[in-house]
């Protein structure tokens, strides 16, 4: 606690944290003082609301407002993860690794076929992507 005893609830969350982790910590602090969903299932209405607002701003092609709404959407998804005791940072790391593995699968096939990625159609790449995905499910 600060020496003057006038500490704010969210003041202990460092600004230097990566945004995803900072969002999780801010939500934890708010929860600790009772600012939380009574029923965690209700969070999905908020996630959908934020997604709708993002889509609306994207249609308007307003980059500033779209960026703001993207942040709101991401914050709500991170909040949902917290409510379901899921670590959003770990989840994103796993997804990044899946993307790398699947893309590398496409690239490996392009090398074997002596066909540069830039000469492959999206359909060909999608087909290989789905093969990579199926191979993951077999393991």
Regions found by a protein language model. Name each.
Residues 1-70, 75-139:
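Flexible "arm" and connector segments at domain edges
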């Amino acid at each position: 606690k600060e020496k003057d005893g006038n500490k704010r609830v969210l003041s202990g969350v460092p600004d230097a944290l990566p945004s995803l982790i900072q969002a999780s910590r801010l939500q934890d602090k708010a929860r600790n003082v009772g600012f939380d969903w009574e029923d965690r299932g209700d969070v999905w209405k908020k996630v959908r609301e934020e997604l709708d607002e993002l889509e609306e701003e994207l249609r308007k092609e307003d980059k500033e407002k779209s960026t703001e709404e993207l942040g709101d959407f991401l914050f709500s998804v991170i909040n949902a993860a917290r409510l379901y005791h899921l670590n959003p940072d770990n989840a994103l790391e796993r997804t990044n690794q899946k993307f790398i593995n699947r893309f590398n699968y496409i690239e490996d096939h392009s090398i074997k076929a002596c066909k540069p990625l830039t000469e492959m159609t999206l359909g060909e790449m999608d087909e290989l992507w789905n093969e990579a995905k199926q191979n993951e499910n077999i393991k």
